UniProtKB/Swiss-Prot annotation:
Belongs to the Nudix hydrolase family. RppH subfamily. It comes from Dechloromonas aromatica (strain RCB). A motif (Nudix box) lies at residues 38-59. This is RNA pyrophosphohydrolase. Residues 6-149 form the Nudix hydrolase domain. Residues 162-182 are annotated as: Disordered. The gene is rppH.
Length: 182
C-alpha cells in the first residue's frame, strides 16, 4: 500500500530500557543494524501496527512495554533506486513513518527474536541513545536523527548538544539470539 507520492506507511520503534539505552537489532544474515520497523496494513492504526511489529520482530507483547511518546507527524526517507525491487521502480519512493518511543517494563529475557517463523533480526543489543546515528545505513540517518531528537524529550536525562553520546563501541555486548536460547 503506497500513498499518492509513492511512500509506504510504516511505523518505527525506539525501545528503551531503564538506563535509556535503545534496542538495536542486527538484520538476519546481514551486517546492518536498525530499529524495529514495519508497514501499516490497511485498516490498522499506527499503534496497532507498532504492537504487531514489536511482536513480529522482537517478540514483545503490549504488557512488556509502556508507550512514552510518538512523533507528531510522518517522517520520510527515500530508498536508493538500486535497493528497490524492479517491479516497484517508478511508483515506490520510500517509507513514511510514525515513530514510537517505548519503555521496556518487562525483562531482557522477554525479548524473543524467533517469536514468528520469519525473524527479522538474528542478534540484538542495548546501545547508548545516540549511537544509532553513527551506525544506521546512510539513507535512513536523517529520519533516525529526526525521530531521536523529537522523542528525547520523553526521557529523563540531560542532553548536551544535538548529539550527545557517551564513548561506547557501537557493537560491543551483542546478544546473539542463538547463544541466548541455550
Amino acid at each position: 500500500m503506497l500513498d499518492r507520492e509513492g511512500y509506504r506507511p510504516n511505523v518505527g520503534i525506539i525501545l528503551c530500557n531503564g538506563r535509556n539505552e535503545v534496542f538495536w537489532g542486527k538484520r538476519i544474515r546481514e551486517h546492518s543494524w536498525q530499529f524495529p520497523q514495519g508497514g501499516i496494513k490497511r485498516g490498522e492504526t499506527p499503534e496497532e501496527a507498532m504492537f504487531r511489529e514489536l511482536y513480529e520482530e522482537v517478540g514483545l507483547l503490549p504488557e512488556h512495554v509502556r508507550i512514552l511518546g510518538r512523533t507528531k507527524g510522518w517522517l520520510r526517507y527515500e530508498v536508493p533506486t538500486h535497493w528497490i525491487k524492479r517491479e516497484w521502480r517508478g511508483s515506490y519512493k520510500g517509507q513514511k513513518q510514525i515513530w514510537f518511543l517505548l519503555r521496556l517494563v518487562g525483562r531482557d529475557s522477554d525479548v524473543n527474536l524467533r517469536a514468528t517463523n520469519k525473524p527479522e533480526f538474528d542478534a540484538w543489543r542495548w546501545n547508548d541513545y545516540w549511537v544509532p546515528l553513527d551506525a544506521v545505513i546512510e539513507f535512513k540517518r536523517l529520519v533516525y536523527e529526526q525521530a531521536l531528537n523529537e522523542l528525547v524529550r520523553f526521557l529523563d536525562f540531560d542532553r548536551k548538544g544535538p548529539r550527545h553520546k557517551k564513548e561506547q563501541e557501537p557493537f560491543s555486548d551483542v546478544v546473539d539470539s542463538v547463544r541466548s536460547e541455550e
